[in-house]
Structure formats: C-alpha cells, structure tokens
Swiss-Prot record:
UniProt xrefs under PANTHER family: HEAT SHOCK PROTEIN 70KDA
Sorted UniProt keywords: ATP-binding, Chaperone, Nucleotide-binding, Phosphoprotein, Stress response
Gene that produces this protein: dnaK
CDD domains linked: ASKHA_NBD_HSP70_DnaK-like (cd10234)
GO molecular function: ATP binding; ATP-dependent protein folding chaperone; unfolded protein binding
Biased composition (Low complexity): 618-627
Phosphothreonine: residues carrying this PTM: 198
UniProt cross-references to InterPro entries, sorted A to Z: ATPase_NBD, Chaperone_DnaK, Heat_shock_70_CS, HSP70_C_sf, HSP70_peptide-bd_sf, Hsp_70_fam
Induction (UniProt): By stress conditions e.g. heat shock.
Stated name of the protein: Chaperone protein DnaK
Membership in a protein family: Belongs to the heat shock protein 70 family.
Chain positions covered by the region annotation Disordered: 603-646
Role this protein plays: Acts as a chaperone.
Amino acid sequence: MAKIIGIDLGTTNSCVAVLEGDKVKVIENAEGARTTPSIIAYKDGEILVGQSAKRQAVTNPKNTLFAIKRLIGRRYEDQAVQKDIGLVPYKIIKADNGDAWVEVNDKKLAPQQISAEILKKMKKTAEDYLGETVTEAVITVPAYFNDAQRQATKDAGKIAGLDVKRIINEPTAAALAFGMDKKEGDRKVAVYDLGGGTFDVSIIEIADLDGDQQIEVLSTNGDTFLGGEDFDNALIEYLVEEFKKEQNVNLKNDPLALQRLKEAAEKAKIELSSSNATEINLPYITADATGPKHLVINVTRAKLEGLVADLVARTIEPCKIALKDAGLSTSDISDVILVGGQSRMPLVQQKVQEFFGREPRKDVNPDEAVAIGAAIQGAVLSGDKNDVLLLDVTPLTLGIETMGGVLTPIIEKNTTIPAKKSQVFSTAADNQPAVDISVYQGERKMAQQNKLLGNFQLGDIPPAPRGVPQIEVSFDINADGILKVSAKDKSTGKEQSIQIKANSGLSDAEIEAMIKDAEANAEEDRKFEELAKARNEADALISSSNKAVKDLGDKVTEDEKTAVNTAVSELEAATKENDVEAIKAKTEALQNILMPITQRAYEQAQQAGGAEGFDPNAFQGGDAGQQKADDGVVDAEFTEVKDDKK
C-alpha cells in the first residue's frame, strides 16, 4: 500500500516525514535541510519555494510571500489581518467574497493557492526520497483553527494534488511523536506549541492499554494569531521607531527596507537566544535628499524580552484555561513538551517552567515533532501501524439559536471527535411552514455574541399548533473537525442539511474573547438566561390564555374576557423590556386571573360528565402548557416564512 506522508504546514517553516518500519524518517529537501521555509516568490514567470525564495526576498519584496498561514480562512476586515497589512512588504487585498487574499504582479491569489505551492514542495521532497508517487497525506493545523481554516487547508492539499486523509491538531501530533518510544505507563502531558504564527496548548493523556497506546486530548486552548511573526514584528516596530528618531525617516513606507528589517529582526531574535547582545547593521537601508542612510542599532536580550513580554504573557492564560477545562492542576502534569521554533526563546522556557513548576522536556525537536506525529497518524490510517489510538477534541462549543436568542449547545467544547449529537426542537408559532436554523460557535449564552458559522432553512412543515412539530437537529463533526448540520421533520421525514463552509475564520481575538467573556461575564450571562426564560414562559402563557378564552367561549363573562385581555396586553408590553421581575409579576397576575376561570370551567365540565381530557393546568403558562409528548423538546426561535399561496 502507498505511503501516507505527514506534513507540518507551518507559518515560518514546513516539514515532511514518513514512517519506515518502526521508525519515522524526517525527509531532507533538495537543499539538504530537514525543514523548508514557508516562503513563496514569483520572479520572471517562475515560482520559487523555500530557501531559493528566501534568498531573493530582499531584492523582490513585493512578490515574496511569507506567513501566508496567518491569512488562510480569514476575512480581510479581521483586525489581525489589518494589523499585518502595515508590517508586510507584499500586498494583502480584499477578495470578492470578503476574504484576505494577496496580489502579485496584478494577479489575485488565494492563501490556499499559495499554501499549495509549499505542499507541492513537501510532496516532491517525499517522492524524491521514496522513489514513488505520493498522493495521500496527513496535514497538521493549529488546534484552534476553525472550520473555515480547516476547509481551506484541505483545499490547499487538493490544489497540490494530495488527498488529505486527515487534518490533525499540531499539539496532538507532537504528543504522538513524544509517546512513540515512551513506554513509561500512563501519564498526562502538556504540549505548549508556540510556532511562527499560532499558539496552542493541549492537555493530553497518554495511556498504556495492554501494550497499545491511547493518546486522548483532554482539553485544548490557544490563540490563532500569536507566534514568532509577532515577536519579529515587535522588534521591527522598535527598529523603525529608533531609526525615525535618529533620521526622521519612516522605513514602513519602503518595501525593500521593510524586507531587510524583517530578515535582520528574525536573525537577531535567534542570536539573542544564545547571546546577551547583538548588533543590527544595515548599510544603505534607505536614502533621502541628504544622501544614503545606514541603520546601526545594538539590541540586548533584556531589550528584546521587554519588547515581547506581553506576547509571552498572553500564552499563559490559555494554559490556565486548558488545565481548568481538563479538571487538572499543574501538579497532575508529568511532562511539558515545547513545540514550535519560538519556544526556543529563553524567556518563553522560563515562563513555562514557572507556570507548570517543572522544566520542559528537551528531548523533543520543536521543529520536527509535529511532522513526525502526522507521519505516525498517516501510518495508522494506512494500516502500517496499529498500536496507537488517537482521540482528539473540538475546541469550541457548537450550537443553534433558540427561542429568546439563547445559544443551545449541541456539541460542547472539548468533546472527543468524531462526534454526532441530536436534539429535538419545535416551532414558535401556530402553522409555521418553515424554520431557519442558525449555527453558532462559541461559549456565550446569547447566540449573537458567538460566531455565526452558517444557516439554512427547513420548509414544507405541515400546518400544526406551535410546539407540536418535531424538528430533529443533528450535528456531525468528523475527525478533521469539519461540521455538518441537518434538520429533519420527524412527521414527514423531510430533511435539509448543510456542510458548514463559512467564508471567514475566527480571529484570535474572537476565540479568546469568547472564552474570557464567558468567564468574566458569567453574571451578565446568568441575567440574560433568566430574562430569556421569563420571556419564554410569558409567551407560552399568552398563547395558552388566548386559546383558553377562545375554547371556553360563553363560559367566560365579558368582564373576565376584558380582564384577561388587559393582563395579556400588560404582559406583552413587559416582555419588550429587560426587567425580569416585571415580566414575572405580570405573568403571575395573568395566571391569577386565569386560574379561577379555568377551575370553574373544569368543575362545570366534571358535573356535566365531560371533563375527560380537560386540564385547568393546561393554561398556567410556562412548561405546564406543553403536551406530555413534547417532553424534552426545546422551543427554537425560527424565522416564520409566510406562505403566499392561498
């Protein structure tokens, strides 16, 4: 059977590996290096990838593309994208669909197309080594990549001529690599993955099951717009400001100077991991009317650490959340594994050690571990390795908007994937012919404060009173973390489904804010939930009150009808405001008016021998108004589609 290769498609560097026998081989590229710069250049009609593209970057800044992974699956308007626009020498543009693309030589290119060039290089590297055609691969992505970003990565693979058999999370792949030759029994590890453009942390349990290994992800957290590029940019910003003070020239306006600064900043950052100071010397960086300008600035390790201290601090909060979600403390962690080139920085290692209370492992190559793990997963899928079971998770809650604007979770965050879950909902109005289903991702109670992934409609629902139709909504998330949602009318069997293909990705700020907001605004969420519940109970009571007056007919006096109508109007007015206590008071007032009426009607019906099936509690509102058959059914807020066909 043909080999399934493992590819780490990185922001700064990429790597390819394959399992041979019982060992994983990290494959050297044509230049003899085990990693390849994730850089693509367009020059004289030729496409350069890797080291050759990097070498000519200074002389061809506008057509040399790097850190493209930061754009994949993202909207042009994302704050994170806007921030990068001023820091890269190439041109980021807004595509027709609103996504962030790039423009090279007047040609618009999608990030998927550009990433495909890197994947082609990885594919060719593997083919040259194996001496056979490679068509299948496992590709890694940051654990916090959302549906759109995962879809875009699969599309890049397809463009590169690869059948992507599985998308797996980078920290999980690193744990696979770490656990491959470790036979030390059960252990819980933390994988801290600070790469070129993204940060992830996963808490993973490695269990020994009769000689086989089970790698189970307990929780994951992260930041999809935090990585080595941000460390470079912090140093670049400092150099630009220092030069501006000395020479009164803004280097950001010069693409050539910006590219030279980028190269120098990256080199200086690496040097400062092993030395206390370095000199950045860029002669003829620019020129003005007074002549050429030279940039000579000394940078100490302490200065760099001061510039990036906030970036390092931003990685610790996700670690805290991941531990909390896993139900563990730092003392439960046996090993801390560092992955990603930026994790080599002494300050990063120091802060990680301080947080976890133990020195990180030094026996895992941070540049190669992810590709090694991907190759192991590829071997599992091809049948070449059968002693490893991988259980990954989805990073954020998935649900739909229900009555009152509430997000009703279908699949909770940190659920093991693949997973399929269903819940039954109903209509919000009598004779409602269709329902709109809005799918959200996030941790807030109010649906619209989360990320809308997509929506679709289920129509042709037979006329029926509200609460009677049974609409089964199913969420199916596959092993790649890609979601499919379906809705089925249980009475007719009619079904509608959607493969979630959002045009935009979740920005780092959005994802981090979702979880942080959910914790920081717990009280606000509780109040909103209480308000939504009060409104739902009020709406149910109003509906049953109107039905009671209509059904009882002449058994209700005119004065009683007036009292009910007045109380209904007052309750309707109360539901339009945000005062929970007022809604509850008006609800109770309406119940107090209704109870004597329905009780009297019930007694009269009993005396006449016709009380069978009549329940005075049916008009009390809240849950009491629901039929027994509807137990477990949640009212869903759907947009009513008016049927114009009379």
